């Protein structure tokens, strides 16, 4: 069900909108984490390392597709808030057609160049073939990833954050059983996890389309989905390019960090894989609160309600702060039990606990940076989110390299480099926020 966010009490609205987003993304992360948990327990740390190495690579390419969806969803939210159904329909059809073509081309390119990508990443020869196979299978499912994210982001732009949650719950459950079947029963190793993931993504996409056909008349497939508006595509790319580059910048930074980690040995790579999964769970609610702020601000921006935009920003930042404190306590206190979910190797667990004790103290900083980025996305100024993310990731890699290679701090170097990156990001964002906020 769609929701008009231009009226009503803002704090309850943000909370109610955010909860399904959080649950949906946690389920999505769950079926990603299940791959790591199952291969870590039933195959070994080599397979766990292979899955972990592929994660930032596949995410980088997926985020290019998500950037297109993000740019479109901002415009869709604006047109929906302005009650302009004609432009809304043209926007949706143009985005879907362009995204399908782009995702298919990207799939072919990525599958062909997978070995070259992994060689550039300096992947250990002992796990190279295993990693290549996993990566190519995941790339084969990019078109399903795009379609689901497009329909889900469109529903959220219209105020419906619950329906995508239900599809992800079903998909996550199917993926868990699929992983167990392929890995435990068929002994297919990391390749089996990849196959299960692609099947789950395809089913999730199918559920989303069937729901829209039956329950959302505004989005039902038909002749209107064959309309291609080049002027709207240019505007979508203008928004989506900045969003895609911002997210790609984050992933390029993660790739840089992953390349540094790959030099530390399989045990550290396996530990980093596990803590990255935990980090994803920790950061996701912060990002979802920001996405709720974006949806609220985009609709109210389209409706010309500036005061509600200011109030929405303040409410969102309060939620970010509360969550930042909560997740610090959880990850600091339960660091070892969390690591034991992924692996039983004591050396790997030790590295992971060291990382979590340091990084959890800093979780409050990305809570603030995510909230600020939610504000700028909502008003359509995505260049600022790109610049601040570029500062963050550049500082991370620049600080991490000497801490690892010169001071030999090992995995402890990474949280310190993240801290430097987040501080740099805040320094880039705050002056622009203060200047922009005064105009609303």
Q: What are these model-derived regions, one by one?
A:
Residues 1-18, 76-141, 185-241, 297-362, ...:
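Short alpha-helical transmembrane segments in multi-pass integral membrane proteins
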Residues 5-42, 56-71, 75, 100-107, ...:
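N-terminal transmembrane alpha-helices
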Residues 16-35, 137, 171, 200-204, ...:
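Transmembrane helical elements of multi-pass membrane transporters/channels
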Residues 21, 25, 37, 74, ...:
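Transmembrane alpha-helix boundary and packing residues in multipass membrane permease domains
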Residues 26, 30-49, 118-125, 181-188, ...:
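Helix-terminus/linker motif at the lipid-water interface of multi-pass membrane proteins
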Residues 45-56, 135, 194, 266-281, ...:
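Small-residue hotspots at the loop-to-helix junctions and early N-terminal turns
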Residues 48-108, 145-164, 271-335, 366-380, ...:
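Small-residue-rich hydrophobic transmembrane alpha-helices
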Residues 69, 137-156, 164-172, 193-206, ...:
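Short runs within selected transmembrane alpha-helices of multi-pass transporters and secretion channels
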């Amino acid at each position: 069900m769609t929701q008009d966010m231009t009226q009503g009490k803002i704090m309850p609205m943000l909370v109610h909108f955010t909860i399904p987003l959080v649950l949906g993304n946690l389920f999505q992360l769950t079926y990603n984490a299940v791959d790591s948990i199952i291969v870590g327990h039933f195959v070994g740390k080599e397979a766990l390392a292979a899955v972990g190495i592929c994660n930032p690579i596949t995410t980088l390419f997926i985020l290019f597709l998500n950037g297109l969806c993000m740019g479109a969803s901002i415009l869709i939210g604006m047109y929906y808030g302005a009650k302009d159904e004609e432009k809304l329909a043209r926007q949706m059809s143009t985005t879907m057609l362009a995204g399908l073509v782009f995702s298919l081309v990207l799939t072919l390119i990525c599958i062909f160049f997978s070995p070259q990508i992994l060689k550039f990443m300096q992947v250990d020869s002992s796990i190279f073939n295993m990693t290549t196979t996993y990566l190519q299978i995941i790339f084969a499912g990019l078109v399903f990833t795009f379609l689901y994210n497009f329909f889900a982001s469109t529903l959220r732009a219209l105020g419906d954050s619950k329906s995508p949650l239900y599809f992800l719950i079903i998909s996550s459950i199917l993926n868990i059983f699929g992983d167990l079947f392929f890995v435990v029963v068929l002994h297919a190793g990391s390749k089996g996890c990849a196959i299960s993931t692609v099947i789950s993504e395809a089913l999730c996409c199918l559920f989303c389309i069937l729901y829209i056909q039956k329950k959302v008349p505004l989005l039902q497939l038909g002749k209107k989905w064959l309309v291609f508006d080049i002027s709207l595509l240019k505007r979508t790319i203008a928004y989506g390019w900045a969003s895609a580059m911002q997210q790609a910048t984050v992933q390029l930074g993660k790739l840089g960090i992953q390349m540094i980690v790959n030099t530390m040995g399989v045990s550290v790579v396996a530990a980093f894989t596990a803590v990255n999964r935990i980090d994803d769970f920790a950061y996701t609610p912060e990002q979802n609160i920001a996405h709720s702020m974006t949806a609220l601000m985009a609709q109210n921006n389209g409706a010309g309600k500036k005061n509600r935009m200011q109030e929405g920003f303040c409410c969102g930042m309060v939620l970010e702060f509360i969550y930042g404190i909560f997740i610090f306590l959880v990850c600091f206190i339960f660091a070892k039990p969390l690591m034991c979910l992924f692996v039983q190797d004591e050396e790997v667990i030790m590295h992971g606990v060291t990382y979590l004790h340091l990084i959890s103290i800093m979780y409050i900083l990305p809570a603030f940076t995510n909230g600020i980025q939610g504000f700028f996305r909502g008003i359509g100024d995505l260049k600022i989110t790109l610049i601040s993310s570029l500062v963050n990731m550049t500082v991370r890699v620049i600080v991490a390299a000497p801490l690892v290679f010169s001071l030999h701090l090992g995995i402890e170097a990474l949280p310190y480099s993240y801290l430097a990156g987040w501080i740099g990001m805040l320094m880039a964002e705050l002056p622009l926020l203060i200047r922009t906020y005064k105009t609303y």
